Amino acid sequence: MLYYFLRYINEMFNPPGMRVIEYLTFRASAAAITALLITVFAGPSFIRFLKSHFLEPVKEEAPEEHRKKKDVPTMGGLLIILAVEISALLWAKVDDPHVWLIMLAVLWMGLIGFIDDYRKVVLKIKGGLAGKYKLVGQVALGLVVGFYTWNDPAFSVLLSKTSVPFLKNFSVDYGIFYIPVVIFIITAVSNAVNLTDGLDGLAAGNAAIVTMALGLFAYLGGNAVYAGYLSIPFISGAGEIAVVSMAIVMACVGFLWFNSNPAEVFMGDTGSLALGSAIAVIALMIKQELLLPVLAGIFFIETLSVSMQVAWFKFTKWRFKEGRRIFLMAPLHHHFQLKGWPEQKIVIRFWIISILLFLTSLMTLKLR
């Protein structure tokens, strides 16, 4: 909204330097700074409020080190959501469908996560919101995003097609499977970020790295010259996604100010589901969802570790009448915890891997 006000001032009075408001790089930077300032300065009072109402419940099977965190408040994802939504409203073109679809995803899945956290923390219902209801929420978001992007003229150029990493001028057409694919990706990615949120700073740091890469792809894909040169899909208006992406990145960085070890607050499902859905929706809109197994490799591996653990345990229980495990505990970060790795070392090493995957994803722009 501030964007529209400043543009009006520019058109009416043409003050020196005001034309900068039209530049995506300026607005993306402004959104990033705004999100960072909101999280850092609102954080202390926000945490005090959460601490008086919402303390993190600790699972009985959690590692010993994790049990020490029973007095740390959760639902800190509300702070991330607040920072992202305010920054997007101020600096992005909110009438652009790319922008409001991301904002909708963050709000909707943030609400689903909040209900889950509230049931666990306040109502003391073990397990929180039943998985089937979370799935209903994820499917509902997938249907909205899928049907809207299928029918809206702003997305009609590529429609159900998507780009394939490493292959030049090659696309895959989902056809009638487009909407089911959208639902699957939103569900998978939001759950993956949720599973990764188990150590101080792990989910927020990796989400920031992944979203920064997607924001860069959005900026390049929204420019016809850059998109043509790099042989990636040109998405008219996708540059606005970069503005919201940078707000998400710096909201996560600001959250890390309080969430880094030892954490003063956890994001909870409120934050992890919101961030995961935002990553999925951004990737889908810029036609880079097939890059996610590489770019979001940490989230992918964490999810795979859980799937492998459950499948192997069930198979061995059926085959040998005794359940066996591949990992000491899943998700994978808990396996390393039980092997004696310090929490900070696990988180930093996972961040380093994410940065490596970030750079690998950028290499796909030319390895075609």
Curated annotation (Swiss-Prot):
Pfam families: Glycos_transf_4 (PF00953). The chain crosses the membrane at residues 30-50, 72-92, 98-118, 139-159, 170-190, 201-221, 238-258, 262-284, 345-365. One of its GO terms (biological process) is cell division. Its cofactor is Mg(2+). This is Phospho-N-acetylmuramoyl-pentapeptide-transferase. HAMAP family: MraY. Belongs to the glycosyltransferase 4 family. MraY subfamily. Catalyzes the initial step of the lipid cycle reactions in the biosynthesis of the cell wall peptidoglycan: transfers peptidoglycan precursor phospho-MurNAc-pentapeptide from UDP-MurNAc-pentapeptide onto the lipid carrier undecaprenyl phosphate, yielding undecaprenyl-pyrophosphoryl-MurNAc-pentapeptide, known as lipid I. Keywords: Cell cycle, Cell division, Cell inner membrane, Cell membrane, Cell shape, Cell wall biogenesis/degradation, Magnesium, Membrane, Metal-binding, Peptidoglycan synthesis, Transferase, Transmembrane, Transmembrane helix. It is a multi-pass membrane protein. Pathway: Cell wall biogenesis; peptidoglycan biosynthesis. One of its GO terms (molecular function) is phospho-N-acetylmuramoyl-pentapeptide-transferase activity. Its EC number is 2.7.8.13. It is found in: Cell inner membrane. It catalyses: UDP-N-acetyl-alpha-D-muramoyl-L-alanyl-gamma-D-glutamyl-meso-2,6-diaminopimeloyl-D-alanyl-D-alanine + di-trans,octa-cis-undecaprenyl phosphate = di-trans,octa-cis-undecaprenyl diphospho-N-acetyl-alpha-D-muramoyl-L-alanyl-D-glutamyl-meso-2,6-diaminopimeloyl-D-alanyl-D-alanine + UMP. It is an enzyme of class 2 (transferase). Its main location: membrane. GO terms for cellular component: plasma membrane.
